[in-house]
C-alpha cells in the first residue's frame, strides 16, 4: 500500500484517491468536491451516482431462471421505492487516519455522497466499455473551450 509512504513523505493525512476511470472528470469537479469535503468534514466523500433502474427489482439467475432478490418489492410501484445510489468508481476524498479503522471505506459512518454528472462516469470492464469511454471523451473534448 502506497498511502502510508505518501503520508509519511508529505506529512499529510488528506487524500484524494482518483481511479483510472476518472479520466473524464474535469479539475473543477475535484475543486468543488474538495470544498464540500472541507466544509462538511465527513469521514469520506465519495463520487456518487443515482441508480436509474430500481435496484429493488434486481434479479439473479439460479438454475437458468431469473429470481427476484427483493421478493417483497417486485409488486411495489417504482414511484414508491426509495432511490438508490452507488459509488461512481471515480474518486474519494478522505483523511487516512479516520478511514484506516474500517475494513472497507464503504463501512465508514459518515460518507458524504458527492453527486456526479453522468457525463463523467464510465465502467471499464470490456472492450465495448472502452469504446464508449473513448466516445464520451471525444464528445466532452469537442464541447470544451
Q: Predicted regions span which residues?
A:
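Conserved core of the sugar-phosphate nucleotidyltransferase
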Residues: 14, 23-115
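Hydrophobic helical membrane-anchoring modules
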Residues: 114-115, 119-145
Amino acid at each position: 500500500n502506497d498511502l502510508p509512504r505518501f503520508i509519511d513523505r508529505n506529512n499529510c493525512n488528506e487524500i484524494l484517491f482518483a481511479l483510472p476511470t476518472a479520466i473524464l472528470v474535469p479539475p473543477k469537479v475535484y475543486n468543488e468536491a474538495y470544498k464540500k469535503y472541507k466544509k462538511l468534514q465527513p469521514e469520506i466523500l465519495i463520487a456518487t451516482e443515482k441508480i436509474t433502474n430500481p435496484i429493488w427489482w434486481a434479479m439473479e439467475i439460479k438454475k437458468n431462471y431469473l429470481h427476484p432478490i427483493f421478493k417483497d418489492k417486485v409488486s411495489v410501484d417504482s414511484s414508491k421505492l426509495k432511490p438508490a445510489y452507488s459509488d461512481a468508481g471515480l474518486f474519494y476524498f478522505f483523511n487516512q487516519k479516520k478511514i484506516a479503522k474500517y475494513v472497507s471505506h464503504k463501512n465508514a459512518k459518515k460518507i458524504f455522497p458527492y453527486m456526479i454528472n453522468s457525463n463523467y462516469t464510465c465502467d471499464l470492464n470490456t472492450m465495448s466499455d472502452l469504446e464508449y469511454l473513448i466516445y464520451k471523451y471525444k464528445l466532452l473534448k469537442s464541447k470544451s473551450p
